[in-house]
Each structure stands twice: as structure tokens, then as C-alpha cells.
């Protein structure tokens, strides 16, 4: 979880003074602290789903400390994102590059109108063990 959670006002990307806008315009402010970087029993997971919203065409930067703080060696990593209008773009490959380890797969983008059935159908179609 994010230590200093974003409020609705923080997420107002149309306001140049909102938290996300300030962070977007100044990369040095994108170091978003997490309450915990590595999930419990991390070493037991073979497959990891990494979900995030798209902000300005890239993965939302709060996910960066999770990616940088974990070793994905020996893990299959499947990115997915949400966005009202942007596609997945290069976000998954940029995260894979940032991680430097793991077997990163093609990801999926879900629109704001996606249902739990849409997500379940995608996951079931991955034919994971």
C-alpha cells in the first residue's frame, strides 16, 4: 500500500497543482513510499500479476518502488492496467526493463467499464497452471 495515499483531489490530473500533476512535471517527486515493498511469502509465488492505472501513457509511478524493490527471478510476471482512454502501450515492457528480472508476459488493458467477467475471462484464457 502507498504510505501517503492519494485523495480524489490529488488525482485530479486536470489541476496543474494536484499531487499527480506536480509529480508528473517533476520526476524527483515520484518516489512514492510504500508501507511494505515485498508481499509476505514472496518467494512462494511463481506467477505475479502487476496491476496499475495508466498515468500520462505510462504505469502509475507508485508501482515503481514495488518493481524496484523485488527480485522477479524465476517468476512469470503478467502486467495489466486500467485506463479510460490510453492503451497498455509500452508500460509492461518499461516495467520489465525496470525490474531486470522475471519472465514478463504480454499484458492487458481494461477500460473503466470492464466487468469482473471481463477480467475473469482474460485470466482463464491465460491457461495458467
Q: Model-found features: residue ranges?
A:
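N-terminal beta1-alpha1-beta2 submodule of the flavodoxin-like/Rossmannoid cofactor-binding fold
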Residues: 3-50, 57-59, 64, 68, ...
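Generic structural signal for well-ordered, non-membrane alpha-helical segments
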Residues: 1-2, 88
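Loop/turn elements at helix/coil->beta-strand transitions in domains of secreted/extracellular proteins
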Residues: 43-48, 73-76, 102-105, 129
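Structural recognition of the beta-strand scaffold that forms the well-ordered cores
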Residues: 3, 47-51, 78-81, 106
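Short, conserved loop/helix-junction motifs that constitute active-site signature segments
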Residues: 68-74, 98-99
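A short acidic, glycine/proline-enriched capping/turn motif at secondary-structure boundaries
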Residues: 55-57, 84
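Short, glycine-/small-residue-rich phosphate/pyrophosphate-handling segment
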Residues: 78-114
Amino acid at each position: 500500500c502507498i504510505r501517503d495515499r492519494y485523495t480524489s483531489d490529488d488525482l485530479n490530473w486536470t489541476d496543474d497543482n494536484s499531487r499527480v500533476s506536480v509529480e508528473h512535471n517533476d520526476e524527483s517527486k515520484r518516489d512514492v513510499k510504500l508501507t511494505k515493498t515485498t508481499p509476505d511469502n514472496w518467494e512462494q509465488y511463481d506467477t505475479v500479476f502487476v496491476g496499475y492505472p495508466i498515468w500520462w501513457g505510462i504505469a502509475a509511478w507508485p508501482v515503481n518502488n514495488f518493481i524496484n524493490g523485488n527480485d522477479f527471478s524465476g517468476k512469470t510476471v503478467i502486467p495489466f492496467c486500467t485506463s479510460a482512454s490510453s492503451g497498455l502501450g509500452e508500460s509492461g515492457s518499461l516495467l520489465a526493463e525496470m525490474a531486470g528480472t522475471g519472465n514478463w508476459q504480454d499484458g492487458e488493458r481494461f477500460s473503466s467499464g470492464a466487468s469482473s467477467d471481463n477480467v475473469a475471462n482474460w485470466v482463464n484464457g491465460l491457461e495458467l497452471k
